[in-house]
Amino acid sequence: MRKFTLLLIALNFFFGCAGDQVSKQGSKGEYGYSLDSDVKVPMRDGINLATDIYFPTENNQRLSGKLPAILVRTPYNKQRGSVVSNAAIFFTSHGYVTVYQDTRGRYNSEGIWHMLDDDGRDGYDTGEWLINQSWSNGKYGMYGTSYVGGTQHAMALENAPGLTTIIPVDAMSNLGYYSMRYDGAFELRFWKWIHWAGQGGGRQNAKPEMKKMLGDFIDVENRRKYLNKLN
């Protein structure tokens, strides 16, 4: 909870325009929420990205007026249980519209996943869509760890419209240097991550045999057998 409190302090600082719709920092706020699931957000090439939008409510009615938003773009499933819902409900309770999106080719989103390659353009298009919604005050911030931090860097580099705050934690930065290799050495942990993360792609979910193959490589013995064949 302390981390959430510190994050809310930062968001309130950068979102000074939020007005009296946003409560003071602290524990859970005064508002309830309603959820629009799998909203299709169009990209410039016609691909639609699945997006969940949590709206603050009062007396079971959505708050009126223009509100700030928090955007999270993730390859790890926007509906990943309590980790997501608790954070979304927390921020929404303080008057923020909270937006979770599956990145391209992941889970319920269309397209093919290319690791962080499309996230700048897709993030820009998502931000442009967001600030043009009737409920938006034109400003939003982002937060998240690891790859979710990398999507923030990608959007910042694209100068995404309306983006006022990023809080990347332990985020990916230079994929050419800190990805498959570290100072020239192949990173086995990253290879394991690829097979684990690969199971969540839209194409993989549509092809059970592909999903099983990727899952089998998570087992250390299977990976060892494969690597031994490369010698």
Summary of predicted features, one role per range:
Residues 5-14:
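Bacterial N-terminal signal peptides
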Residues 24-65:
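N-terminal cap/lid segment of alpha/beta-hydrolase-fold proteins
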Residues 58-132:
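Cap/lid segment of the alpha/beta-hydrolase catalytic domain
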Residues 93, 157-231:
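Accessory cap/linker subdomain of secreted extracellular hydrolases
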Residues 134-147:
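Alpha/beta-hydrolase fold nucleophile elbow
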Residues 147-160:
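Short glycine-enriched nucleophile-adjacent loop
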